[in-house]
Amino acid sequence: MISAALLWCLSAAAYAGNAVENPDSLALVNAEWNWKSIGKGGEAGSAKVKMFGSDQTISAVKYPAARFKTKILHCPGDESSTTDMLASRHGYTVGVNGSYFNMRTLEPCTFFAMNKSVISLTPKSEGFRTNGLLAFKKKNGREMEVLYCDSTKFDQYRKNYNMVIASGPVLIKDGDTGTFAQDKYFTEKRHPRTVVGQDAKGNYWFIVIDGRFPGVADGATIPETAAIARYFGLKDAINFDGGGSSTLWTEATGVINYPCDNKKYDHVGCRRVPNVIVAK
């Protein structure tokens, strides 16, 4: 039987096209991912890849949306904790950090609504990077949408979706790469990045690109992050909070990536966050 990981490699290789034209995509496909089952057809893997003229450490989880329940956990203020702790504490088997937040109050600072109630709104200062939404119509999270965010429609989003959170930028929408704000620090400088998205085969993907460890994990610009999502075969993808927040965890593997909040290249430098995307 061909494993799901091998099927991904074959499809990604086909998507990548000519090796001479696209060496970065083939470097991603040909890396040693060491995929591990997380149950119910889901897999987790991590690899060190030389691409974009840099050294990358990339971790990914993919799972069939129809066999998992996906949710956004809201744990602000004193309820906040690290991504791995929040996911495990609430009985989930997969977790990735969520959207932008106030690091002093540990409250979300982007539009966020659950169960028809608005939790927070996006201030104008966040508009340049928070141009998207991750939305789920059903409580079980089995219908994901990545949308461009219109701040005049927050009440409409609240009514139409069971869970919806603003983040960004949108990396890929319906197979098309997004247009990114020109910003030397956020967009054009390499940082740790977190990506949530879906492919055309019914799989949800959580991806973390580690950074701030030169020569091992250089991090990615926003255009490079979009390219990585595309190389994985995602048709829809959105960028979430990065930097020291970027954390990817599964019950089967523990923290997969190398969170940088402790400035050490290990698996324990996780930052407290107020919301996470989880699945079980």
Residue ranges and their predicted role:
Residues 50, 162, 169-201:
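Conserved beta-alpha junction segments in alpha/beta enzyme cores
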Residues 1-19:
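Bacterial Sec-dependent N-terminal signal peptides
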Residues 93-97, 135, 197, 205-207, ...:
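Structural recognition of the beta-strand scaffold that forms the well-ordered cores
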